[in-house]
């Protein structure tokens, strides 16, 4: 499944959430975010970081095979007033349109995490209003190289949390992904599951 298709599907989820969050300002937005959809990771002085655990999945290659090294995930950031002012100030300095930015509350970013390359590409960035409607959209906004980020970097902590979640919920991601497992990956997963079951059995015998 491509990143664009995922963005379209998640757009429908944001629209549904907008009905629930209508009129909610950023100060209260975190309390209103549906916890069964969004996984909270961290909050800084400027924003809260979430990812959509109902839509996180693996990408598929050109042959329709699931690529276990590439994760597609929609993310959500909730801004505080200082971050809102910072975003607006930067847009004003760059002479970009400001229509709708009086109601800025956060941003949606669609990530493609390439585990083999060690990169995270933001395939799209959307600034959101208080009803989670899109104010503006930027394609292929930026790319991060994980190795170049400090372990204390909040972005790296966010990305690592998503990667860890994906590893712990691999079966869920596979079922959700739009593709089929290659025979090689199916064999590797079967071996991993057999090894895990063996270790679990050994632990049960000798706690």
Functional labels for PLM-detected ranges:
Residues 13-22:
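Bacterial N-terminal signal peptides
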Residues 4-5, 21, 172, 191:
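General helical secondary-structure elements
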Residues 2-14:
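Bacterial N-terminal signal peptides that target proteins for export
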Residues 27-109, 113-207:
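N-terminal secretory-pathway/extracellular module detecting exported/lumenal segments
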